Amino acid sequence: SRIEQEEIFGPVLSVIRVKDADEAFRVNNGVKYGLSSSLYTQDVNLAFRAMQELDNGITYVNAPTIGAEAHLPFGGVKQTGNGHREGGWEVYEFYSETKVGYVDYSGTLQRAQIDNYDD
């Protein structure tokens, strides 16, 4: 249906009847958007399976937050229109290069630590 294929932001509840988790995952993953999904279950195996298999930026299990994760780099996947992946601390790693420099002011030649020598 059309409501399955739209990325709706607002007070809208869509109820889609499915026969099992496999079908629910197919419906979820069959849309071109992937901001977030919610799952309500007491089955911890199903919860972790959902977090692994659902094709979206964030998976809520039993609604643990209010949905304002601006500090995280999830931003959604596929053609979702909300946010960027450059959120959270990971942005520093993405846009950074690490360099190392060693300075010796002793004025003497230093031998490698692996050298075995007698002086």
Regions found by a protein language model. Name each.
Residues 1-119:
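Conserved C-terminal structural/oligomerization subdomain of aldehyde/semialdehyde dehydrogenase
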